[in-house]
Swiss-Prot record:
Its EC number is 2.7.1.21. The gene is TK. Transmembrane segments: none annotated. Residues 88-106, 148-160, 194-203 have a biased composition (Polar residues). It is an enzyme of class 2 (transferase). This is Thymidine kinase. Belongs to the herpesviridae thymidine kinase family. It comes from Epstein-Barr virus (strain GD1) (HHV-4). ATP binds at residues 291-298, 445. Substrate binds at residues 355, 451. The active site is at residue 317.
Length: 607
């Protein structure tokens, strides 16, 4: 279109352009342009018939736009910011001089490009300043320093009119995050980030209602937040859940904590992926130490582990699972026992929940141990060189002994007692070592141990626990002489234990002894429990399964009163009974796999 300013000069009626180019072709014409410029007017004017001379500029074709949006300058090859077109360059093209609007380019320049230089002036590239002068050698480089030194931050109506709506939306976003220009993240040593002085002038110009100084000022404020938060990443805690979480703020201490937390969370126990290992088959005898609290089970296990070393696998009591996983079941149980709220349904429900939690680790570990048993090798009698698998308690205590004690104390209802009893399982080869101790000595050891949750236990509690063990032991003796079906018939009231003795073709035990065992056993309690519903098949099946499972066990009795502080002598007694009893047998296990599994259970118990 003819007459458009900034267009190349054509024939003698077009525009004449006096801009020097740095290309090699125009270098030889340098003197020629200088001679012509000596005779040319200071202001370029259009010539010829297409000049439009004498016409009024009503349509605004020659008016330079005044609301150019500021452009972000690209990054140069050296990594420094190339200054962009500033507001000063824009306002210089909008002066009152009629020729000034023709000396610069009215169209939008590409990013990083410079407006045409006036005559007699060779355009020069901007000299970038080193960052060390702006932010100091020990401070974090400021990404907005290149912009603060331009005239765009000087304010003015033209510099804020187009970007005001963007800036207002940005203000609302910062307000939603609890951030503003006077954020608490700003410190005294950041005095170079103050608001430009033109803001007060603009506020006075608008009658006290000053507009914000533009979008880039708020970006600079955002840079202050970024700089401060990068030094104090702990303040991100109050910004949790907001868009500020996308910032990648590095802090040495937080990084170490994150790595430690990630390492802890990704550590998977070997029991989950025990697949690629070389099995080592060894014969081992499984012993389960049982007894009242404080008799010395843990002390004995620690002694045997130190003596036998790799020939022994010690399975500790799962105390951490009982006390630190979800609720503290030990504390809740002792609280119900000491309060003695007998015969209440809510108490029975709480006790049932605790007992079910006590049974979980034993059932899980028994299942895992069963998977590592080499059944093809069978079982054999205990030999002197066999290994030992020593457990701190058996599932028998959690599902039979202590529930029986709680049932007799009226802390557990009949229905809840049946629920716990149904969880009892045992494997052939499990040997129970019942460590008995008189109540006085047991109470002394319990107080010496000094556990807080055991402070409310008294001698009556220990006596009731010993009675429960005795009842289970008497029931086990009955399973060694009578068939499980006959014992269940006695519990259902279909016959008596004396009749069963007389009907036996080869009586092994006298009827008087059998009657005494029955009265002291758990079966006398079971008869009372199932009597109202003795025709129910489920109750009878629970009793039958319990009797059959109980017959799998073997018992070793040790009176600790005879071995006062004599751990080697106590172990000798246990060892000799295991060798003499042909029913106590060793089984073949994958010793390497079992060691890894138990080590993970033991590690979890220590954490």
């Amino acid at each position: 279109m003819a007459g458009f300013p900034g267009k190349e000069a054509g024939p003698p009626g077009g525009w004449r352009k006096c801009q020097e180019d740095e290309s090699p072709e125009n270098e030889r014409h340098e003197n020629f342009y200088a001679e012509i410029d000596d005779f040319a007017p200071s202001v370029l004017t259009p010539t010829g018939s297409d000049s439009g001379a004498g016409e009024e500029d009503d349509d605004g074709l020659y008016q330079v736009p005044t609301h150019w949006p500021p452009l972000m300058a690209p990054t140069g090859l050296s990594g420094e910011r190339v200054p962009c077109r500033t507001q000063a360059a824009v306002t210089s093209n909008t002066g009152n001089s009629p020729g000034s609007r023709h000396t610069s380019c009215p169209f939008t320049l590409p990013r990083g490009a410079q407006p045409p230089a006036p005559a007699h002036q060779k355009p020069t590239a901007p000299t970038p300043k080193p960052r060390s002068r702006e932010c100091g050698p020990s401070k974090t480089p400021d990404p907005f320093s290149w912009f603060r030194k331009t005239s765009c931050t000087e304010g003015g109506a033209d510099s804020t009119s187009r970007s005001f709506m963007y800036q207002k939306g940005f203000e609302e976003g910062l307000a939603g995050l609890g951030l503003d220009d006077k954020s608490d993240c700003e410190s005294e040593d950041e005095s170079n980030f103050r608001r430009p002085s033109s803001h007060s002038a603009l506020k006075q110009k608008n009658g006290g209602k000053g507009k914000p100084s533009g979008l880039f000022e708020h970006l600079a404020a955002h840079g202050r937040e970024f700089s401060k938060l990068s030094k104090h990443a702990a303040q991100l805690k109050r910004l949790s859940g907001s868009v500020m979480n996308v910032l990648n703020l590095d802090d040495a201490q937080d990084t170490r904590q994150a790595k430690a937390q990630r390492k802890e969370s990704t550590r998977v126990p070997i029991v989950i992926h025990l697949t690629n290992h070389v099995p080592v088959i060894k014969p081992a005898c499984s012993l389960f130490l049982e007894g009242a609290p404080g008799v010395g089970k843990t002390t004995m296990l620690n002694h045997l582990k130190a003596v036998f070393g790799d020939l022994t696998i010690v399975v500790p009591e799962p105390m951490r699972y009982w006390t630190h996983v979800y609720e503290n079941a030990i504390k809740a149980m002792h609280k119900n026992v000491t309060r003695a709220r007998h015969g209440r349904e809510d108490t029975s429900a709480e006790v049932l929940a605790c007992q079910m939690k006590f049974t979980t680790p034993f059932r899980v570990l028994a299942s895992r141990k069963r998977s590592l048993l080499v059944t093809e090798s069978g079982a054999r009698s205990v030999a002197p060189l066999d290994c030992w698998i020593l457990h701190d308690r058996h599932l028998l205590s959690a599902s039979v002994v202590f529930p029986l004690m709680l049932l007799r104390s009226q802390l557990l209802s009949y229905s809840d007692f049946i629920q716990v009893l149904a969880t009892f399982t045992a494997d052939p080869g499990d040997t129970i070592v019942w460590m008995k101790l008189n109540v006085e000595e047991n109470m002394r050891r319990l107080k010496k141990r000094g556990r807080k949750h055991e402070s409310g236990l008294d001698a009556g509690y220990l006596k009731s626990v010993n009675d429960a063990y005795h009842a289970v032991y008497c029931a086990w003796l009955l399973t060694q002489y009578f068939a499980p079906e006959d014992i269940v018939k006695v519990c259902a009231g279909l016959t008596t234990i004396t009749t069963v003795c007389h009907q036996s073709h080869t009586p092994i035990i006298r009827s008087g002894v059998a009657e005494k065992l029955y009265k002291n056993s758990i079966y006398s309690v079971l008869k009372e429990v199932i009597q109202p519903y003795r025709a129910d098949a489920v109750l009878l099946e629970v009793c039958l399964a319990f009797t059959r499972t109980l017959a799998y066990l073997q018992f070793v009795l040790v009176d600790l009163s005879e071995f006062q502080d004599d751990l080697p002598g106590c172990w000798t007694e246990i060892y000799m009974q295991a060798l003499k009893n042909p029913a106590i047998r060793s089984q073949f296990f994958d010793w390497a796999g079992l060691s890894k599994v138990i080590s993970d259970f033991e590690r979890g118990n220590r954490d």
